[in-house]
């Protein structure tokens, strides 16, 4: 699975009915991450899992006699929810999932493929019912541009004076674009053009324009889930804002490839930005005149691909000479990232 937590967790749901014993492995970064919260509900289907204390590598023995389950997902993990949905698709009977609001790509795909799914939307939770067994039709699918990848260049544009960026054909699923709303509240100008539906998902072209005055923010927690992968970048924008920005209820960031709140604080400290970090919040004292004229070294970050790429964006935005280790950390999620950075004129050794 490389260092892809999404691939690792989703494939476990698909392997619940495997007739062969399967061993799932990942790189060092992924092997440090917790898989127990997806293993536990999948065991209820009847499959057997032998793991390294809830971590990779994991041995899976599928079941021929799976039974539908009831599952309460209260962390807002789309990966866990989707893994259970995939397992339910090949299980006779109706599986019922009560899930905290999270990304809904799997639900939209199920609907587009006309698979047997019912969704009742509540205030904070969705009730999802999946009926199995059901064959999945084949389809050709061209994946739209990923907002999490686009966000690096959106933030670089936001932090670069007199800049305009256009990105074509970006997935603007409402459960993914919290970063738009947060950046707009901070004064960044983002507009959507040519909005259309593509196989259940909304896509659009994006226009991003920088601003001379970035505003501080008391970030509404309603955007946390839909911006969870972009917060490291958002914190860079807060570093350049006028005033104090506050972000809370972000303990989920510490369940990623590295404890990202801690690493955000470290990066901010290195660039001279005062901040106060707790287990689930961070307060950032912005400096609109921020400019770096020293050497900065970023290493020992558990090969978290987003820490690497965020550090590159910080270097381009704030100046200075940066030495950033472990560039191989981006090989799974964004292998062409440095080529795109090089195209923009950055000097990379």
Predicted regions and their residues:
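Structural preference for solvent-exposed beta-strand-turn elements
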Residues: 1-349
């Amino acid at each position: 699975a490389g260092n892809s937590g999404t691939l690792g967790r989703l494939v476990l749901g698909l392997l619940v009915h495997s007739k062969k014993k399967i061993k799932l492995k990942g790189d060092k970064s992924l092997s440090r991450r917790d898989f127990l919260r997806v293993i536990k509900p999948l065991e209820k289907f009847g499959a057997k899992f032998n793991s390294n204390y809830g971590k990779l590598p994991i041995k899976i023995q599928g079941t021929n006699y799976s039974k539908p389950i009831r599952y309460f997902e209260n962390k807002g993990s789309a990966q866990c929810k989707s893994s259970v949905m995939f397992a339910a698709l090949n299980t006779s009977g109706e599986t019922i999932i009560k899930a905290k609001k999270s990304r809904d790509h799997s639900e939209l795909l199920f609907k587009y493929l006309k698979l047997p799914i019912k969704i009742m939307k509540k205030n904070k939770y969705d009730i999802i019912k999946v009926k199995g067994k059901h064959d999945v039709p084949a389809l050709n699918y061209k994946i739209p541009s990923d907002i999490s990848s686009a966000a690096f260049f959106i933030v670089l544009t936001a932090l670069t004076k007199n800049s305009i960026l256009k990105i074509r054909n970006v997935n603007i699923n409402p459960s993914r674009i919290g970063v738009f709303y947060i950046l707009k509240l901070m004064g960044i100008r983002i507009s959507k053009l040519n909005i259309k539906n593509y196989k259940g998902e909304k896509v659009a072209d994006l226009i991003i324009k920088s601003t001379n005055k970035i505003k501080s923010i008391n970030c509404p927690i309603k955007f946390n889930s839909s911006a969870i992968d972009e917060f490291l970048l958002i914190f860079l924008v807060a570093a350049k804002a006028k005033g104090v920005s506050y972000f809370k209820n972000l303990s989920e960031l510490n369940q990623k490839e590295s404890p990202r709140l801690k690493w955000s604080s470290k990066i901010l400290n290195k660039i001279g930005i005062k901040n106060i970090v707790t287990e689930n919040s961070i307060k950032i004292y912005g400096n609109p005149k921020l400019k770096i004229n020293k050497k900065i070294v970023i290493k020992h970050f558990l090969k978290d691909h987003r820490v690497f790429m965020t550090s590159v964006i910080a270097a381009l935005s704030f100046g200075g000479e940066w030495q950033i280790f472990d560039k191989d950390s981006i090989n799974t999620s964004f292998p062409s990232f440095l080529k795109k950075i090089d195209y923009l004129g950055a000097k990379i050794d």
